[in-house]
Amino acid sequence: MPVFRLTEELIFPPSYLAERDGLLAVGGDLSAERLLLAYRQGIFPWYTEKTPILWWSPDPRLVLFPAELKISISLRRVLRKNVFSVTFDRAFADVIRRCAEVRRARDDSTWIVPGMVTAYSRLHRLGYAHSVESWHEGELVGGLYGVALGRVFYGESMFTRKTDASKVALVHLVDLLTRGGFQLIDCQVTTAHLQSMGAREISRRRFLTLLAENIPEVVHGESWEGESCCGKRP
């Protein structure tokens, strides 16, 4: 199938027209309006400094249903010991910067290019993009960020500089989302790490159905800073 080239018009082709690898469209921009439209339709940007903006809608899709989170025995020990303190939306800029510093082994590149940092920082200011931070002795040692729409959270990236730091951030995120009535966490691309924590693949068709059921027509952004962690204040 052809890969569609986007124009200034705020529109995407249907996701079922994506290539076998999930590539759907090329070009466009990273405006807040386009990004929110993309997420609503199950599409996300993923590209490098050497390529134009690429838009993806893979099939199957890796997702984590909050109730299916798996916590290993060793991770439960870490949680009981309170090795890390966890916060929300307290250091978004630092989290996305640390995630961008994680390089892909095969070509030493990153998909979190400066344009992506700018775009998601804008979404954060609008209350749609959020971060979860894991701290150890006052130092940011792990975390993740993503986008929340309705009852769906779209995970974008995570980093860790101390064993289990990002896993602890994910556990606290799932707790917050569960208490907030969220039904789905989009993990985008399949990885063994996320599968080990309970994520599983579903068809694109089912994924899009879940989005339609859980994202209302009008969605307002809000800050998560100051939210409690697993029932405790951060």
From Swiss-Prot:
Functions in the N-end rule pathway of protein degradation where it conjugates Leu, Phe and, less efficiently, Met from aminoacyl-tRNAs to the N-termini of proteins containing an N-terminal arginine or lysine. PANTHER family: LEUCYL/PHENYLALANYL-TRNA--PROTEIN TRANSFERASE, LEUCYL_PHENYLALANYL-TRNA--PROTEIN TRANSFERASE. Coiled coil: none annotated. It is found in: Cytoplasm. The keyword Cytoplasm applies. HAMAP family: Leu_Phe_trans. It comes from the Bacteria. It catalyses: N-terminal L-lysyl-[protein] + L-leucyl-tRNA(Leu) = N-terminal L-leucyl-L-lysyl-[protein] + tRNA(Leu) + H(+); N-terminal L-arginyl-[protein] + L-leucyl-tRNA(Leu) = N-terminal L-leucyl-L-arginyl-[protein] + tRNA(Leu) + H(+); L-phenylalanyl-tRNA(Phe) + an N-terminal L-alpha-aminoacyl-[protein] = an N-terminal L-phenylalanyl-L-alpha-aminoacyl-[protein] + tRNA(Phe). The gene is aat. This is Leucyl/phenylalanyl-tRNA--protein transferase. Keywords: Acyltransferase, Cytoplasm, Transferase.
